[in-house]
Amino acid sequence: CSQSQISKIEKGMIYPSSILLYQLSERLGIDPNSIFALTQNKKLKYVENVKYVMRDCTKQKQYKELYEIVKQEKNQNNFQSTEDKQFLLWHEAIVIFMVNKSTKIALNLLNHALKLTLTNMDCLSEREIEIMQTMAIFHGENKEYEKSINILRRCLTNFNKLDFPRDKEIKLKIIFNLAKILGHTNQHEEAIKYNDIGIKLAINLNTLYLLGELYYGKGWNLLRLKQNNEEDVADIMKKALFIFELTEKEYLIKIIKENYFENQNKKKHP
């Protein structure tokens, strides 16, 4: 946290992120709950605040920070209800996979988390769908593509059965991952179909979440089809780059420039 950030927080110009609040409480050696009580989230319970921080870490891919929080919360035993225990196990699995690279242990933790509430595989809750999707992502990263695709299809079917889903971005993530894995298995036409569904959904939800990645995925899959319109691909890639620049995703900006735009320049100026 820079001095300029601290000054802005003191003047009320910006609000500190939940991750920063958590780290600040650790630095000061005080109960994080007392820090959260001073923020606008004071009505929320301690566990809900920590869960919010954990989700924030996951979304921002801050896995080492998440690892520290999981370790601390396991020792403190604040997560007592079945749902809270499930949430902690789920995020422990994420850090075990992302930080320790232990697929087997991570999948065992996810299975354990799922069994805490699972009653019917054909009627999953929103949380159970999220846990199943994490399983699919792990299998995909492990190049077990068919397993991953089957789980993601089940997740999508179950999500579509929910009457009042609280977080529609879960569906967006399922569609994105399904398109990604289908692309890896050379099922490019079906992958493009899901890219298009995802793009429409993101626009309908008024969110930039995964929109750039969906455009890039569509362009990537189109390039792998024998018949593709170069102008269409260029237009799609420009949209992806624009969104990556807008959302300051430096890693993805680098990838799209190296994998597409620099190659196009070489073709034009050999």
Q: Can you say where each PLM-predicted feature lies in the sequence?
A:
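Short alpha-helical DNA-recognition segment
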Residues: 1-8
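Residue at a conserved register position within TPR or TPR-like alpha-solenoid repeats
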Residues: 57, 96-97, 132, 139, ...
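Residue signature of alpha-solenoid helical repeat architecture, marking inter-repeat boundaries
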Residues: 44, 82-85, 119, 124-126, ...
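Residue register of alpha-helical TPR repeats
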Residues: 48, 87, 128-130, 171-173, ...
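Structural motif corresponding to the intra-repeat A-B loop/turn of tetratricopeptide repeats
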Residues: 60, 99-100, 135, 142, ...
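DNA major-groove recognition helix of helix-turn-helix/homeodomain DNA-binding modules
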Residues: 19-34
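Amphipathic alpha-helical segments of tetratricopeptide repeats
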Residues: 70-78, 111-121, 153-164, 196-207, ...
